[in-house]
């Protein structure tokens, strides 16, 4: 499947100065009998070092880029095309530079290619020595390459060092057209990341700044909640798909988010000391007792022991009313308070009156006088 000479020439004109390798023009194997190609039409890295006026295809410029960067024989639009070519075939193939065709043979050895690259390197060094002032102005700009990626078009020193390193190494694996845009993109990316990082770090703080109105520590309770939902909960409007506010923190740790909300279900008679004392959870209605404030101090019924009841009955049999001194003595003897002794005697007198009233109705009133203690003040 060999192609004719006309077809080959049309293909080379179609691909614009034959950016494909020399071994890819006439099939998979070189040396297939077609040797009538013009080597001057092929612009490779190792040929035409002094063709400033006859510029090759901008997608594949030669090694001597110094005159083009300084503005000699190349306008700004073409220079922009040199920089912005992300899909170069040299980077797609793997960065291997095509071999030049010399003396009617295909596949020049790599050592001869290095020898052909040396004149272009000497020319670059001469141009660098002729413009020492430009180099001194551009050397400080190398340190500012990360912060100012737009100034890379004015820094030929960086590209000159890369070309010299690629020529001395003789490997040619560094794609000339792919590395500078990659550095440009990476430096711009890191610069944008550094510029946007403090913005995003300070953004939640700015959005959570309104939580200082009534909520002490919202970030500890709900870091994963959306700020919009938090704002709606503060304004009294629950977010879409959110559970009720009364059930939001039931069973969780510190539900501090609902202490200052207008839509809280806690009744207005909540103890104000619960918030100021630093309690971990507010006092919900089911935690409160069913009695009012005045009834909360009511004590339960005192259960007297059999010994206490026996001693009190003995004292009541002799005296219905007790003096202050006797009340204190009985309180110390029975380990009770004076109030308990006084209440017990009051209840016991009411019981005694009921008993006397029922007993005095069927008979005479003399029976009631017999039950009355003799020393009781009536």
From Swiss-Prot:
Q: Where is this motif: Antp-type hexapeptide?
A: 283-288
Q: Which Pfam families match?
A: Homeodomain
Low complexity: bias regions: 101-132, 243-281
DNA-binding region, residue range(s):
297-356
Q: Which UniProt keywords apply?
A: Developmental protein, DNA-binding, Homeobox, Nucleus, Repeat
Tell me the InterPro entries matching this sequence.
Antp_homeobox, HD, HD_metazoa, Homeobox_antennapedia, Homeobox_Antennapedia_CS, Homeobox_CS, Homeodomain-like_sf
Which Gene Ontology BP annotations are present?
anterior/posterior axis specification; anterior/posterior pattern specification; heart development; lymph gland development; midgut development; muscle cell fate specification; negative regulation of transcription by RNA polymerase II; neuroblast development
Give the free-text miscellaneous remark of the entry: Loss of Antp results in altered development of the embryonic thoracic segments. Overexpression can cause antennae to be transformed into legs.
Q: What is this protein called?
A: Homeotic protein antennapedia
């Amino acid at each position: 499947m060999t192609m004719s000479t006309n077809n080959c020439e049309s293909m080379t004109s179609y691909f614009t100065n034959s950016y494909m390798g020399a071994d890819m023009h006439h099939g998979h194997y070189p040396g297939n009998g077609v040797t009538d190609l013009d080597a001057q039409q092929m612009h490779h890295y190792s040929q035409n070092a002094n063709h400033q006026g006859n510029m090759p295809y901008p997608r594949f410029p030669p090694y001597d880029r110094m005159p083009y960067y300084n503005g000699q024989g190349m306008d700004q639009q073409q220079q922009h095309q040199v920089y912005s070519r992300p899909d170069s075939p040299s980077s797609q193939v793997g960065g291997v530079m095509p071999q030049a065709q010399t003396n009617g043979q295909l596949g020049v050895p790599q050592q001869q290619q290095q020898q052909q690259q040396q004149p272009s390197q000497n020319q670059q060094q001469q141009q660098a020595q002729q413009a020492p002032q430009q180099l001194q102005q551009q050397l400080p700009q190398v340190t500012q390459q990360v912060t100012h990626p737009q100034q890379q078009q004015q820094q030929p020193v960086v590209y000159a060092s890369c070309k010299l390193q690629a020529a001395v190494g003789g490997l040619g694996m560094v794609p000339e057209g792919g590395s500078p845009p990659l550095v440009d993109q990476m430096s711009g990316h890191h610069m944008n990341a550094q510029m946007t990082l403090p913005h995003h770090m300070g953004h939640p703080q700015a959005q959570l700044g309104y939580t200082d109105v009534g909520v002490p520590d919202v970030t500890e309770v709900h870091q994963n909640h959306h700020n919009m939902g938090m704002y709606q909960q503060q304004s009294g409007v629950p977010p879409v798909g959110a559970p009720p506010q009364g059930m939001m923190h039931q069973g969780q740790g510190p539900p501090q988010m609902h202490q200052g909300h207008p839509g809280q279900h806690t009744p207005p008679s909540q103890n104000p000391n619960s918030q100021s004392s630093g309690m971990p959870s507010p006092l919900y209605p089911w935690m409160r007792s069913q009695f009012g404030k005045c009834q909360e101090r009511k004590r339960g019924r005192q259960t007297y022991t059999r010994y206490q009841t026996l001693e009190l009955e003995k004292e009541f049999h002799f005296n219905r009313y007790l003096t202050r001194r006797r009340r204190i003595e009985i309180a110390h003897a029975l380990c009770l308070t004076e109030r308990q002794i006084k209440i017990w005697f009051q209840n016991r007198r009411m019981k005694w009156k009921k008993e006397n009233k029922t007993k005095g109705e069927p008979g005479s009133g003399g029976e009631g006088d017999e039950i009355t203690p003799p020393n009781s003040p009536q």
